[in-house]
Amino acid sequence: ADIIEAYRMATEAMRRREPCSIAYHGNIVDLLEYAEREKILIELLSDQTSCHAVYEGGYCPAGLTFEERTRLLHESPEQFRHLVDISLRRHFEVIKKLVARGTYFFDYGNSFMKAIYDAGVKEISYNGVDEKDGFIWPSYVEDIMGPQLFDYGYGPFRWVCLSGKHERSEEH
């Protein structure tokens, strides 16, 4: 779906109070900037890009196709890094505006807020200077799972077995 169609489908599903899954092929920054411009309320928002490897291709800068991103990543890593930083700053600014209008945003634990900080946005840190006190938005674990399950660094869930083979889960 394109941006307009994606939001139309989401709005219609919400009106009907029905679950809906929409595949949007594009950049999240463009999608969120459209929502902000059009005053579309996003109630719950997170980010699941691979920001633990933001400059190694885990984040595709707004304005580039995936193919352009891949070419630039290999041919001009410094230019790629520059475009990632610009896009991360735009990403932060639009999320900040959406949060001010009522969106609940949380970091999914993918180093998104750290990547924004590394892109030069000190405002994302609690103290506005460095990352030692954490960031302004909560992470999924600390804010959603943490209050009941993981406050003390441990909880009822220890291992995830992605193979689906029970014997693998017993190795740990």
Segment roles from a protein language model:
Residues 1-158, 165-167:
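Glycine-rich phosphate/ribose-binding loops and adjacent secondary-structure elements
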Residues 171-172:
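Conserved small/polar residues in nucleotide/adenosyl-binding loops
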